[in-house]
Amino acid sequence: MHELSLCESLVSLLEEEMQKLGCGALKKVVLQVGPLALIEEGAMRFAFEVASKGTVVEGAELFIEWIAVRGYCLDCQKEALVYKIGESCPCCGGVMILSEEGKDLKVASIEVE
């Protein structure tokens, strides 16, 4: 479960930012995640809760926005946007091959008190 190590790094990063900003508590974190980051949403939420326990990040809501990447269908040979690995082609239901992009995992925004 690499989500835990990702969340431990995320919490450290957020703590540093909170200290720089001089804020007391974090209310909300919005992550943007590409399909090739291989993140399982439930595991990420659980890991965030565990990693943030006892920190200024504890209790913050985690929002995950899935970033679409361009995929190519092997069957109908059309391009389409794909949000998750394993999605079928929206045109024909065929197998989609993802581009090299989509490995992103970034903090899009935070909300503080």
Swiss-Prot record:
Keywords: Metal-binding, Nickel, Zinc. One of its GO terms (molecular function) is nickel cation binding. It comes from the Bacteria. Ni(2+) binds at residue 2. Zn(2+) binds at residues 73, 76, 89, 92. Gene3D superfamilies: 3.30.2320.80. InterPro entries: Hydgase_Ni_incorp_HypA/HybF_CS, HypA/HybF. The keyword Magnesium does not apply. Coiled coil: none annotated. GO terms for biological process: protein maturation; protein modification process. NCBIfam families: hypA. Involved in the maturation of [NiFe] hydrogenases. Required for nickel insertion into the metal center of the hydrogenase. Belongs to the HypA/HybF family. This is Hydrogenase maturation factor HypA. The lineage of its organism: Bacteria, Pseudomonadati, Verrucomicrobiota, Methylacidiphilae, Methylacidiphilales. The gene is hypA.
